[in-house]
Amino acid sequence: MSSHEREEELRKRLRLIHLLHQTIDSYPTGPGTANQRRQRRRRWRRRWQQLLALADRIYSFPDPPTDTPLDLAIQQLQNLAIESIPDPPTNTPEALCDPTKDSRSPQD
């Protein structure tokens, strides 16, 4: 993988993490009882921790190998070519045509 491809892959990952970050609501504020505010903060903290764990997995996910066995198999299949198949024979072998000669009977 060239350095340009690696940089592009890193940019994709960072854009995905940035998009995930934008989907999380901001830190909760607002009216409500102390218990309601506490519950909102707990839910927000759980979502934030999930986002951090997901971002870590996205960022640290290894690059796919360029020459996996599947890629090699696909390349080999692409190199195959169908050749012309010869016409079948028009005459039948005599062993198949002669009904008196039984090929299953033991030879004397």
Swiss-Prot record:
GO terms for biological process: mRNA transport. One of its GO terms (cellular component) is host cell cytoplasm. Its main location: host cell. Gene3D superfamilies: 6.10.140.630. A motif (Nuclear export signal) lies at residues 70-82. A motif (Nuclear localization signal and RNA-binding (RRE)) lies at residues 33-49. It is found in: Host nucleus, Host nucleolus; Host cytoplasm. The keyword Transport applies. One of its GO terms (molecular function) is RNA binding. Residues 99-108 have a biased composition (Basic and acidic residues). Residues 83-108 are annotated as: Disordered. Escorts unspliced or incompletely spliced viral pre-mRNAs (late transcripts) out of the nucleus of infected cells. These pre-mRNAs carry a recognition sequence called Rev responsive element (RRE) located in the env gene, that is not present in fully spliced viral mRNAs (early transcripts). This function is essential since most viral proteins are translated from unspliced or partially spliced pre-mRNAs which cannot exit the nucleus by the pathway used by fully processed cellular mRNAs. This is Protein Rev.
